[in-house]
Amino acid sequence: QQDYTGWFDF
């Protein structure tokens, strides 16, 4: 699931 920062939430 992609986060708003462009990273991914684990």
Swiss-Prot record:
Tissue specificity remark: Expressed by the skin dorsal glands.
Pyrrolidone carboxylic acid carried by residues: 1
Position of the signal peptide: none
One annotated Gene Ontology cellular component of this protein: extracellular region
Superkingdom classification of source: Eukaryota
GO biological process, one term: defense response
Sorted UniProt keywords: Amidation, Amphibian defense peptide, Hypotensive agent, Pyrrolidone carboxylic acid, Secreted, Sulfation
Modified residues (Phenylalanine amide): 10
Residues where Sulfotyrosine is found: 4
Localization (cell): Secreted
PTM summary: Isoform 1.2Y4 differs from isoform 1.2 in not being sulfated.
Keyword match Secreted: yes
Similarity-based family: Belongs to the gastrin/cholecystokinin family.
Function description: Hypotensive neuropeptide.
Name used for this protein in its record: Caerulein-1.2/1.2Y4
Organism field: Ranoidea citropa
